[in-house]
Structures are given as C-alpha cells and as structure tokens.
C-alpha cells in the first residue's frame, strides 16, 4: 500500500485506459482498495528529469513549471492558468502554490503513467508532450487526439484534483467525488470537437445517470465514467454548484442510490 501522505490516484491520469500503461493490472488493483488519495508515486525514483531544469514562475505567480525543455514551459503555464480560471469559476480556490514538473517518465507501484498530483508537496507531474504519443496504449481513445490536446487534458485533470484538494480544507473527500470533478474539468476545458471525439469513443446513453458515477464503474470503464460525469455536469442547471457542494463536504456521489 502507498504511504498515507500520497493521494491514491484520482489524480493520476494513469487511472484512465490510454493514460495508464498496464490497465488490466491496474483494474484489479483498483478494485482491491479504497482510494484515499490522488496519486501514488513509487518510493524510490518517482520521475526522471533531465539536464538540471530551472523552475519558471508563470504569469500567475501561484503556478510554476519545471521543464528540461523550455519550449513547453509557456504551454504548461497557459493550460494550468486556463484550468485554474475555470475551476475558480466553479467556486474552488488555490491558497497554496502549485509546481508542475514536466518529466520524461513517472513511475509507481502499478506501472508508468502520464500525470500525477502529489498533495503533500503540491506538485503535479506530467510527461513531456514529446513523450506522450509513444506512451499511449494501442487503441486508446486518446490516440485520436493531437498531443497538445492530450497534454491540456492531463494538466486540467491534475489541476482539478489539486484545487479540489486545497479547497476542501482538510475534509476527507471520497475518491469518486475527486474523480468526478477531474473528469468533468478534463472534458469541459478541451475544444468541443475533441470532447465529442472522446465521448464518441466511450458513449453513454442519455440522460446521464448519477448511479453510474461510482468507483466501481470508474474501475471497469473509466472513459464511460468520464462521459457520464461530463454529461451529468452539463445537464445540471448549474454544474458548478455540485462541485462547490463536493468541495464543502455537503454532497457525495457515494450517498446516491444505485
């Protein structure tokens, strides 16, 4: 089991087929524990960074990027600020600085992944864009997306976990609620054309069903979970109100009838 100070995935984009590189093993692991955290990192060397990169502060000085390749710093800052802006619109907050590390490789006990959020150190780790395409599982829904869009989705997903965790003020939020918010933001923020491509790759019949927003469904069908989550968010009069309720501890999908 991972140390308590690491949040178990919801934040990890590895939990998505196509993001996660050994999905069968992941699925069994996922169903055998309750997620209390947002990312699991191996105790030894959680990431590989080349060539002594420098931490660059974004225009939003609460965000900074560490990258061995400077050309991706501006892109990472742009996507992080864009995601933060949307999350703030939904009532979340960022009281603490967040660092984003662009790395060649991220490892944990169940395999390699493309992105994680470490809530202890407030660090998001994302694979460098140039490494993403080769890391995707064959047939992944993400393989139809341009690399830049995948990178945007990864950054948005982890920013959602980070701001939800910071906004909860220590409230112990359920795994499924964390993953709901991250899935919603990942799909909500990318261009509608690419959002629809992901939805078409894992369609869920309308109307959206709150009973499908569960850790069990996420374990077996993460992309259908994400489709249903975004459709549920989009169908509500004020989808952001649900996110505010989750952050305040006033709502959980674990309490909804199945």
What is the predicted role of each segment?
Residues 133-154, 173:
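Short pre-active-site segment immediately N-terminal to the catalytic Zn-binding motif
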Residues 53-71, 133-136:
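Acidic/histidine-rich, surface-exposed loop or edge segments in extracytoplasmic proteins
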Residues 192-258:
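Long, well-structured alpha-helical subdomains associated
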Residues 36-45:
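Bacterial N-terminal signal peptides
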Residues 153-166:
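Active-site recognition of the HExxH zinc-binding catalytic motif
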Residues 165-187:
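Post-HEXXH active-site segment of zinc metalloproteases
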Residues 72-132, 145-148:
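Auxiliary, metal-adjacent structural segments of Zn-dependent hydrolase domains
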């Amino acid at each position: 089991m991972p140390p308590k100070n690491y949040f178990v995935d919801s934040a990890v984009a590895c939990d998505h087929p196509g993001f996660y590189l050994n999905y069968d093993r992941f699925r069994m692991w996922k169903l055998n524990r309750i997620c209390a955290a947002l990312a699991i990192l191996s105790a030894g060397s959680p990431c590989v960074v080349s060539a002594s990169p420098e931490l660059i502060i974004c225009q939003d000085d609460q965000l900074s990027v560490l990258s061995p390749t400077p050309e991706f710093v501006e892109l990472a800052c742009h996507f992080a600020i864009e995601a933060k802006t949307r999350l703030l619109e939904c009532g979340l907050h960022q009281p603490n600085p967040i660092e984003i590390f662009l790395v060649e490789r991220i490892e944990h006990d169940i395999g390699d992944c493309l992105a994680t959020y470490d809530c202890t150190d407030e660090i998001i780790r994302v694979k460098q864009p140039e490494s993403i395409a080769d890391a995707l599982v064959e047939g992944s829904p993400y393989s139809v997306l341009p690399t830049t869009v995948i990178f945007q989705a990864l950054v948005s997903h982890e920013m959602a976990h980070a701001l939800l965790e910071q906004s909860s003020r220590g409230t112990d939020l359920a795994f499924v609620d964390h993953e709901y918010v991250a899935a919603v933001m990942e799909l909500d923020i990318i261009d509608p054309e690419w959002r629809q491509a992901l939805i078409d790759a894992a369609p869920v019949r309308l109307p959206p069903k709150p009973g499908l927003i569960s850790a069990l469904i996420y374990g077996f069908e993460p992309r259908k979970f994400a489709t249903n989550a975004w459709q549920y968010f989009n169908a509500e009069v004020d989808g952001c109100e649900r996110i505010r309720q989750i952050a305040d501890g006033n709502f959980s999908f674990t309490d909804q009838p199945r």
